[in-house]
Amino acid sequence: MTTFLGNSVTFTGKQLQVGDIAKDFLLIATDLSQKSLKDFEGKKKVISVVPSIDTGICSKQTRTFNEELSELDNTVVITVSMDLPFAQKRWCSAEGLDNVILLSDFYDHSFGQDYALLMNEWHLLTRAVLILDEHNKVTYTEYVDNVNSDVDYEAAINAAKILP
């Protein structure tokens, strides 16, 4: 059971499991361009999913993964939220982070639905970490039980670092 602000939440779809091949997505970047999983083809992907970039835990999650993992060879760190691209861009400017890849699922919520990340009651994404290899095979997942808590940074960072 997953909770948000002390209340149970429900999801549509099936959570990704280690070994699954991640379905392609179409998300909106801060420059309003469309980005898909294919845009990161051949790279390892750390997908950090947050409800809103403007909250303390979500900001911490985004900064932590970018600081710890952005220097890994052939790896991209992608943060996905339901925030409008304008808010994501403003956050990057305010934080002084120019190389962060922030993508939004605001347009049709398909990423959240396909990856079982969309909290039906709130129309926000839950907190999660998904790590994919170069072929989009899922190598690590964490869907948090309490959306108001941190992900297991150490486990996710270690999982990303051991990918060949």
UniProtKB/Swiss-Prot annotation:
Enzymatic class:
oxidoreductase
Cross-referenced SUPFAM superfamilies: Thioredoxin-like
Q: Which cysteines are joined by disulfide bonds?
A: C58-C92
Q: Give the EC number(s) under which this enzyme is classified.
A: 1.11.1.24
Pfam families per UniProt: Redoxin
Q: Which residues form a coiled coil?
A: none
Q: Report domain Thioredoxin positions.
A: 16-162
Identify the InterPro entries for this entry.
Redoxin, Thioredoxin-like_sf, Thioredoxin_domain, TPX, Tpx_CS, Tpx_Peroxidase_subfamily
Keyword Disulfide bond listed? yes
Q: Which reaction does it catalyse?
A: a hydroperoxide + [thioredoxin]-dithiol = an alcohol + [thioredoxin]-disulfide + H2O
Q: Where is the active site?
A: C58 (cysteine sulfenic acid (-soh) intermediate)
Arranged from A to Z, the UniProt key words for this protein are: Antioxidant, Disulfide bond, Oxidoreductase, Peroxidase, Redox-active center
Query: Which Gene Ontology terms cover its molecular function?
Result: thioredoxin peroxidase activity
User: Could you share any additional remarks the record makes about this protein?
Assistant: The active site is a conserved redox-active cysteine residue, the peroxidatic cysteine (C(P)), which makes the nucleophilic attack on the peroxide substrate. The peroxide oxidizes the C(P)-SH to cysteine sulfenic acid (C(P)-SOH), which then reacts with another cysteine residue, the resolving cysteine (C(R)), to form a disulfide bridge. The disulfide is subsequently reduced by an appropriate electron donor to complete the catalytic cycle. In this atypical 2-Cys peroxiredoxin, C(R) is present in the same subunit to form an intramolecular disulfide.
The record's section on PANTHER family has: THIOL PEROXIDASE
Relate the protein's function as given in its record: Thiol-specific peroxidase that catalyzes the reduction of hydrogen peroxide and organic hydroperoxides to water and alcohols, respectively. Plays a role in cell protection against oxidative stress by detoxifying peroxides.
Matches recorded under HAMAP family: Tpx
Per UniProt, subunit arrangement is: Homodimer.
Against NCBIfam families, the record matches this protein to: PRK00522.1
Family membership noted in the UniProt record? Belongs to the peroxiredoxin family. Tpx subfamily.
Protein name as catalogued: Thiol peroxidase
